[in-house]
């Protein structure tokens, strides 16, 4: 018996399996880790540009595995498809080419995402129904807002490597977002990244305690001066 090949997708359309996803325990461990700390631990070279939170409550954070979508600017057909494929805890990350002329997601899609128990949405493009997004519950990061709606014609691809507001995002990457922006990390880097992040958080906690103490004890401020001067001397400065 001859096997029947699966029907081919038209050019520009594709839906792929996501493949590797982060260990749920690792995802949970990253909740509450600031994006600034993760960015520093990744060499200060990764992070979104031009995205801002639109979910109202700046204390609301995003943490989950990426389900990536690439769309034609101004078209959201494949985002609708992605919503039907998403699992609880996923983050839909959309490469909309940074176009802000037409909204790619609105209030109805927000409700669909909430029903799917998504961890959040990141859109390199516009959203609309801003008041509804600002109610919170679902973290959303986007490049802008537009009242003009999208088309639903395609093409588009799901679970492919994408570029999103300066980020290189692959399906299954860990996505973190907070008031400072969005960062991503590949699943295989998470164990060592988590260790580094915890060490940095411990260092910062120590520094915070020192600064608080120095408000009441001026003698402690000399430590800060010496630390800065040591950095300058290492660069040849005569201090």
What are the language-model segments listed below?
Residues 175:
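C-terminal binding/interaction regions
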Residues 2-171, 184-239:
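Feature captures the catalytic cores and cofactor-binding loops of soluble hydro-lyases/lyases
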